[in-house]
Amino acid sequence: MKSMILPRLTVLIVTLNNARTLQTCLKAIAAQDYPKNLIELLNVDGGSTDETLNILKRFGFRSVHSTIPGNAEAQRGIGLKLAKNNLIVSLDADNYLPTDQWFREMVQPFIDDPTMVHANTLHYRHDYRDTVYNRYCALFGVVDPIVFYIGRPDRLAQYQKSWTLGNVVKETSAYVSVDFDLGTLPTVGCNGVVYRRDLLLKHANSAPEQFLHIDVFADLVAKGFTRFAIVKNDVTHDTAVSLPALMKKRIAFLSGYYLKNTLKRRYLIHNPQKITDQIKLLLFILYTVTLIKPLIDSAVGFYYIRDPAWFLHPVICWIYLYAYGAASIKKLKLRLFS
């Protein structure tokens, strides 16, 4: 690939007290084999009080204080509006790029196909040296096991090598081109992805107050912008949370972003109007309560990759069942007593 045909990029990172992971994230960005004059470094910060902003400054990022503090989704919407370039590399502060070719690999689908909307990695990176929960997420390809069982993950489990969701229209040695509809669109838009700014601004409900990183791409799919790429590489997601912290974080996330009446969802991981989704949700509850299916899935994964982190799966299923249940009860109470 010649540098003269490489597109300009805006690297967008949203932050809130991310000093623990940020330096590792930014070092990997700085090491990319990509012309520096083609890269804008943009940060939208939600009110950090640790060393986050100083670290960003050292690495050459332009930091903007969010007008909607403490809301990562709104920060993404603000960054979308402020970006100078059309291709946005969206990274969280706990995402680490595994090689210096990552930018080049991720933009290739956009160079090859002018209708391309979004590109994400095939896997999360698995590293035996990582924490057990990070390894679990990388092994199963999801943070949320409900997504795994309903069948809408945006990454594959480590033992899965072929992408089958949606309508596969082209496969190369480097990536898969897929057309999605609203029934097959996975949970895209976050943790190491590249997407087009122009389409989101013109055709999606991308105002910061309403921005949700999956829903804006559902807006595009609904309007006929259906071409997505699954790039055959990976990205590290360093969640590094304890299991109690995970439960607390997930309840807050669901209550804040996904169960509020003020946010009209255009994308539903579980659509209560669809019988198939209802059945899959009931099966997830049954699987979690009985433990049998999660243990079988753990054993299958362990057969391919000998990492005991697979067997965290039954525990994570219980945590998420509790988190969704607690958030749903909280929403019901608000309806009844507000």
Protein language model regions, located:
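Short aromatic/hydrophobic "clamp" motif used to bind/position activated sugar donors
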Residues: 88
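N-proximal low-complexity "stem/linker" segments adjacent to membrane-targeting elements
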Residues: 1-28
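Non-catalytic, C-terminal membrane-associated alpha-helical segments of glycosyltransferases
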Residues: 251-255, 269-338
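Conserved donor NDP-sugar-binding/catalytic core segment of glycosyltransferases
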Residues: 101-158
